[in-house]
Amino acid sequence: MANLRELRSRIKSVNSTKKITKAQELIATSRITKAQARVDASQPYAHEITKVIERLASASSLDHKMIREPKDPKRAAILVVSSDRGMCGGYNNNVFKTTAELRKLLEDEGKEVVLYVLGSKGVTYYNFRNENISGSWTGHSQDPVYAETLNLRNHLIGGFLAGSEGTVDVVDGVNAEGDQVPGFDEVHMVYTEFHSMLSQVPKAHRLLPIKTVVEEEKMELGSDMVSDSADQVSAEVDFEPDADTLLANLLPQYVSRGIFAALLEAAASESAARRTAMSAATDNASELVENLSRIANQARQAQITQEITEIVGGASALGDSGESD
């Protein structure tokens, strides 16, 4: 049986670890509420700018590369959204697995893949495997700031507009080797979508070129151009300035919206994954302390029994010695 002193030392160590995991669980729980609120607050803007882009795309004759399908894409960029910190279960591994699946799919289509990584864990993961990273950003996974996404957006749009035949200058805030990196014809993003406290699903999404879905309105006999709903108006719209100018200026904003929304989802998912992992770790620590305490009690009882046996044996020996005298 294990030494009683060693058991007590292990119990003390596990209890110390339990305090850390419990604190991490409480911190993650508080962050989830804030992250969920930010995700919900971003939805109205995302919904409205999507409707505006679709309306402009239907009214515009602009042949912009950001909304035009490439004829022969040769290189695709993947933005991998990971975390800056660990202790979040399989959160990062699920992202890396989805990235590997997307990468294989793109390579099977004959496209060269370049990686852009957001989060220290992703940078460490790919550096350890000697994977080339074209650019990285760190320090913003838990609390993304919209202004910080602008450098990321500008770099990705610049690389996309340059195309696979060109190069793009590295903008401020991007960690990259050299002052220029190759351009690309597509931009994909892999991040974790928040569904609930217990469900976070890695998702692969094409960011550029933008897919615009314009739904044709069906008119029925006797209906007019104004919907019964107050927020759905189907009348013709005059744009000021013209639709082409508006669309060209709104497309970068739309990309920013897509990136920031994904980062908010990822932040909420990271906190939820960390809370789940830390809750499980705390429960395991409690169970381990209980088992170690039981073993320690058994060891203590065995020690006491042995001491009593030795005392009784010693007393008997003294008694026998006295009788012989």
Swiss-Prot record:
Pfam families, per database record: ATP-synt
Membrane topology field: Peripheral membrane protein
GO biological process per UniProt: proton motive force-driven plasma membrane ATP synthesis
InterPro entries hit by this protein: ATP_synth_F1_ATPase_gsu, ATP_synth_F1_gsu, ATP_synth_F1_gsu_CS
One GO MF term attached to the UniProt entry: ATP binding
UniProt superkingdom: Bacteria
Chief localization: membrane
Matching Gene3D superfamilies: 3.40.1380.10, ATP synthase, gamma subunit, helix hairpin domain
Keywords: ATP synthesis, Cell membrane, CF(1), Hydrogen ion transport, Ion transport, Membrane, Transport
A GO cellular component entry from the record: plasma membrane
Subcellular location: Cell membrane
NCBIfam families for this protein: ATPsyn_F1gamma, PRK05621.1-2
PANTHER family for this protein: ATP SYNTHASE GAMMA CHAIN, ATP SYNTHASE SUBUNIT GAMMA, MITOCHONDRIAL
Subunit structure: F-type ATPases have 2 components, CF(1) - the catalytic core - and CF(0) - the membrane proton channel. CF(1) has five subunits: alpha(3), beta(3), gamma(1), delta(1), epsilon(1). CF(0) has three main subunits: a, b and c.
Function noted in UniProt: Produces ATP from ADP in the presence of a proton gradient across the membrane. The gamma chain is believed to be important in regulating ATPase activity and the flow of protons through the CF(0) complex.
Similarity annotation: Belongs to the ATPase gamma chain family.
Protein name in the entry: ATP synthase gamma chain
Source species: Corynebacterium urealyticum (strain ATCC 43042 / DSM 7109)
